[in-house]
């Protein structure tokens, strides 16, 4: 379970975000809401990119607000993808594990498997600037999945992970996530504008409304 209790964050212009909720995470969660409703703010608080002024954020009996972002059990996919354009797609995924050390043989096998499952094996040695937006999105998703598999960072925060994907590719990505939830215990929270996603994922839908004051 992921529990947010009386989380408050004040924006620079004075408006503040206030939110309490218990996510059981037994199935994926899809967060939806109008533009500006606080969806990205919520993910950024969980990820530790912004700090609330009050409240607590509890996951597996730990208050994540007392844990540095790098130590939290998270695998994050940002809406922009956050890929480094000057290094290969493969290296973009590898640095999700370790910025400096070598990747071991087991990790290499997992990375290869994830690339194959996402249909991006042909793009391992090219730069992100040389592939399409949908392919870039799959590289970013691969990095999140590899972190979950190799580092045990199984709370996955995915911001619009299916943007730019055709229906067939999207279905493959969804099936891979569902399989990970069932077999490996991923806990998945997705921000999505697509009203079909909760049904496709078999997910609980949480709509953000009236949480900005």
Model segments located where?
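ABC ATPase nucleotide-binding domain "signature" region
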Residues: 30, 139-148
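Helix-to-loop junction immediately C-terminal to a conserved catalytic motif
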Residues: 47
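Conserved ABC ATPase "signature" region
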Residues: 63, 105-123, 178-179
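ABC ATPase NBD coupling module
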Residues: 63-76, 80
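Short coil-to-helix segment of the ABC ATPase nucleotide-binding domain corresponding to the Q-loop/switch region
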Residues: 87-96
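Conserved ABC ATPase signature
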Residues: 127-131, 135
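Catalytic Walker B motif of ABC-type/P-loop ATPase nucleotide-binding domains
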Residues: 152-160
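Helix N-cap at the start of a conserved alpha-helix in ABC-type nucleotide-binding domains
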Residues: 167-169
């Amino acid at each position: 379970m992921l529990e947010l209790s009386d989380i408050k964050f004040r924006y620079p212009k004075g408006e503040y975000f206030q939110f309490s909720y218990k996510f059981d995470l037994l199935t994926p969660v899809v967060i939806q809401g109008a533009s500006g409703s606080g969806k990205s703010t919520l993910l950024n608080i969980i990820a530790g990119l912004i700090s609330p002024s009050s409240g607590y954020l509890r996951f597996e009996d730990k208050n994540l607000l007392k844990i540095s972002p790098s130590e939290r059990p998270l695998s994050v996919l940002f809406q922009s993808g956050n890929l480094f354009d000057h290094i290969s797609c493969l290296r973009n995924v590898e640095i999700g594990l370790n910025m400096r050390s070598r990747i071991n043989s087991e990790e290499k096998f997992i990375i290869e498997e994830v690339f194959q499952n996402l249909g991006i094996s042909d793009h391992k040695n090219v730069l992100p600037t040389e592939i399409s937006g949908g392919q870039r999105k799959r590289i970013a998703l691969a990095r999140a999945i590899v972190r979950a598999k190799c580092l045990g960072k199984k709370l996955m925060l995915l911001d619009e992970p299916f943007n730019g994907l055709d229906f067939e590719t999207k279905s493959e990505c969804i099936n891979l996530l569902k399989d990970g939830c069932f077999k490996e215990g991923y806990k998945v929270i997705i921000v999505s504008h697509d009203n079909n996603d909760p049904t496709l994922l078999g997910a609980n839908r949480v709509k953000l409304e009236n949480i900005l004051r």
